[in-house]
């Protein structure tokens, strides 16, 4: 049985004021993993019809800065957001349809990869994006190439 996230408590723990837009954005990001801003805005607007687009952008920025939401932006793609934060995972992106899936780190602890030379930086994260074809697109691609 999965537990229902306590968004108000998450906000308080991050020293953020609990507001309806913040709770609605957390709910939307949790319900729509890897969603773009438009999808999140639509979900929030459904729950709070009077919320502005700018308010959603501002909340996403605040939640990302507080570490409650993670922003990812694969090359050539719009920014997307997820609620899976603070763990050791990366992403797989379909080159054809753009779908994104989580993939756990294969080896080690965060940051998951060890740079051969960190150039004096204190490393705390490695962002890895795998690219390929999702199962649906690979089936379509195979069926097109083999009549």
Curated annotation (Swiss-Prot):
Subunit structure: Homodimer.
Residues binding Zn(2+): 34, 82, 91, 94, 97, 102
Region annotated Dimerization, chain positions: 86-147
Subcellular location: Cytoplasm
Keywords: Cytoplasm, DNA-binding, Iron, Metal-binding, Repressor, Transcription, Transcription regulation, Zinc
SUPFAM superfamilies: Winged helix' DNA-binding domain (SSF46785)
Family: Belongs to the Fur family.
Primary localisation category: cytoplasm
One GO term of the biological process aspect: negative regulation of DNA-templated transcription
Region (DNA-binding): 1-85
Function: Represses transcription of the catalase-peroxidase gene katG and its own transcription by binding to the promoter region in a redox-dependent manner.
Any GO molecular function: zinc ion binding
Organism: Mycobacterium tuberculosis (strain ATCC 25618 / H37Rv)
Protein name as it appears in the record: Transcriptional regulator FurA
Annotated Gene Ontology cellular component terms: cytoplasm
Superkingdom, natural source: Bacteria
Reported induction: Negatively autoregulated.
Residue sites binding Fe cation per the record: 87, 89, 109
């Amino acid at each position: 049985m999965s537990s229902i996230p306590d968004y108000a408590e998450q906000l308080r723990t991050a020293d953020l004021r609990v507001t309806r837009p913040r709770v609605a954005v957390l709910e939307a990001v949790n319900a729509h993993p890897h969603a773009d801003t438009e999808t999140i805005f639509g979900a929030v607007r459904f729950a709070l019809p009077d919320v502005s687009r700018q308010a959603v952008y501002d909340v996403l920025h605040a939640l990302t800065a507080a570490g409650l939401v993670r922003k990812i932006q694969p090359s050539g793609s719009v920014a997307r957001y997820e609620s899976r934060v603070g763990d050791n995972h990366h992403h797989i992106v379909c080159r054809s349809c753009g779908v994104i899936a989580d993939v756990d780190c294969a080896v080690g602890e965060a940051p998951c990869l060890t740079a051969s030379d960190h150039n004096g930086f204190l490393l705390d994260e490695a962002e890895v994006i795998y690219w390929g074809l999702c199962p649906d697109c690979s089936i379509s691609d195979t069926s097109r190439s083999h009549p």
